[in-house]
């Protein structure tokens, strides 16, 4: 299952790879890839740990982006099709 999400479909020039938006996009694609791997290999615990680490890093980046640029955050979660953060 090779489902990749495109960030640069209609957003104009390509963003730099160090930007927060690109890092979240890249982590999301890795999460999708690793999730499909874990559906076939459910006892691959080292991959599960890697998935949890990726999800934690993506969450921290989303928190940072939501605090600094809420419009970009909302656009990004809509493009990627991921849930927003829980507000406390």
From Swiss-Prot:
Q: CDD domains given for it? A: S15_NS1_EPRS_RNA-bind
Q: Which coarse location class applies to the principal site listed for this UniProt protein?
A: plastid
Coiled coil start-end: none
Question: A cellular component term (GO) from this record?
Answer: ribonucleoprotein complex
Keyword field: Chloroplast, Plastid, Ribonucleoprotein, Ribosomal protein
Tell me how this protein assembles.
Answer: Part of the 30S ribosomal subunit.
Could you tell me the Gene Ontology terms of the biological process aspect for this record? translation
Species per Swiss-Prot/TrEMBL record: Angiopteris evecta
By its UniProt entry, which SMART domains does this protein fall under?
Ribosomal_S15
In alphabetical order, the GO MF annotations are: structural constituent of ribosome
Instruction: Read off the Pfam families from this record.
Output: Ribosomal_S15
Localization recorded for this chain is: Plastid, Chloroplast
Q: Which InterPro entries match?
A: Ribosomal_uS15, Ribosomal_uS15_bac-type, uS15_NS1_RNA-bd_sf
| Family to which the UniProt record says this protein belongs | Belongs to the universal ribosomal protein uS15 family.
Record-given protein name:
Small ribosomal subunit protein uS15c
Lineage in the entry? Eukaryota, Viridiplantae, Streptophyta, Embryophyta, Tracheophyta
Q: Which SUPFAM superfamilies match?
A: S15/NS1 RNA-binding domain (SSF47060)
Source taxon at top rank: Eukaryota
């Amino acid at each position: 299952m090779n489902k990749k999400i495109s960030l640069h479909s209609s957003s104009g020039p390509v963003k730099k790879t160090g930007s927060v938006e690109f890092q979240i996009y890249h982590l999301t694609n890795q999460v999708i890839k690793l999730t499909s791997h874990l559906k076939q290999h459910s006892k691959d615990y080292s991959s599960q740990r890697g998935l949890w680490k990726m999800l934690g890093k993506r969450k921290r980046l989303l928190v940072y982006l939501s605090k600094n640029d809420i419009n970009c955050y909302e656009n990004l979660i809509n493009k990627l099709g991921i849930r927003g953060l829980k507000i406390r």
